[in-house]
């Protein structure tokens, strides 16, 4: 999940653009005009989206704004004399998708305003959330905790060791197992002990995890997938089933509510123009 923090880095891939014989390029976060650090207001494309901002002595200053095709704001990146301060990412309907305060905090939202994930960059704590706003999965240092929608702990691990939360393992006649807490079934385990399925308080499937493949899948209460992946790749989904965010090793992509890619860390920068 920490990989999701990469979305807020301004990645410049050294594309070139010629305008009236003048050559512009981005290199290591600096904009150059005929090999000299440039000052002025520039327009360019990141992927297919138009971006505009002011640069002073090659460094971004003020607000760098990226827009959707219809002209609505997709992202604002705030700088002061080249220092990155914060980011705001928006859905097409104007609702915040994400806020990022450099070195402090990041929050990610669905288009209805629901908080999906949060990251405290000072403590290293990361959290994902149920639809009712309660924490779902929390990582704090070496401790990981899974909660049901009523904020009740289903399991807790620290330093790779399972913490006793008062659960009981019960074997059934067919060789499968149930995990009980306070005389209530909170999880089920297959006969081989390879796949465990944690449950919502009302019995719906919340999360499945395989000790063989390493695959994990988390579900909304209606049964649709919220997340699926392993240690090297993962996908998060909107409530409508469309993909929201995807990472594979060092690559990542963000998508709008219709499943269209809007941001990635491998977008090319093209069509650089100085407008002021």
Short names for language-model regions:
Residues 1-4:
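Positively charged n-region of N-terminal signal peptides that target proteins for export
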Residues 7-15:
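Bacterial N-terminal signal peptides
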């Amino acid at each position: 999940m920490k990989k999701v923090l990469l979305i807020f880095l301004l990645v410049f891939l050294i594309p070139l653009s010629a305008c009236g014989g003048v050559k512009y390029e981005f290199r290591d976060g600096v904009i150059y005009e005929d090999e000299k650090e440039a000052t002025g207001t520039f327009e360019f494309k990141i992927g297919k989206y138009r971006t505009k901002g002011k640069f002073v002595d090659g460094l971004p200053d003020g607000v760098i704004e990226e827009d959707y095709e219809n002209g609505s704001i997709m992202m604002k990146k705030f700088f002061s004399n080249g220092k990155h301060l914060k980011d705001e990412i928006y859905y097409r309907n104007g609702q915040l998708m994400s806020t990022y305060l450099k070195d402090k905090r990041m929050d990610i939202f669905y288009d209805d305003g629901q908080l999906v994930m949060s990251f405290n960059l000072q403590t290293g704590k990361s959290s994902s959330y149920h639809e009712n706003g309660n924490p779902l999965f929390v990582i704090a240092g070496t401790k990981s905790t899974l909660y049901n929608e009523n904020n009740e702990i289903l399991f807790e691990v620290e330093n790779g060791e399972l913490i006793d939360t008062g659960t009981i393992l019960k074997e059934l006649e067919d060789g499968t197992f149930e995990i009980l807490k306070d005389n209530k079934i909170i999880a089920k385990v297959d006969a081989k002990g390879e796949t465990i399925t944690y449950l919502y308080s009302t019995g719906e499937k919340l999360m499945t995890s395989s000790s063989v493949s390493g695959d994990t899948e988390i579900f909304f209460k209606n049964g649709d997938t919220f997340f699926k992946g392993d240690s090297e790749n993962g996908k998060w989904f909107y409530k409508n089933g469309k993909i929201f965010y995807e990472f594979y090793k060092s690559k990542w992509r963000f998508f709008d509510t219709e499943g269209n890619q809007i941001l990635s860390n491998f977008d090319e920068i093209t069509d650089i123009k100085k407008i002021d």
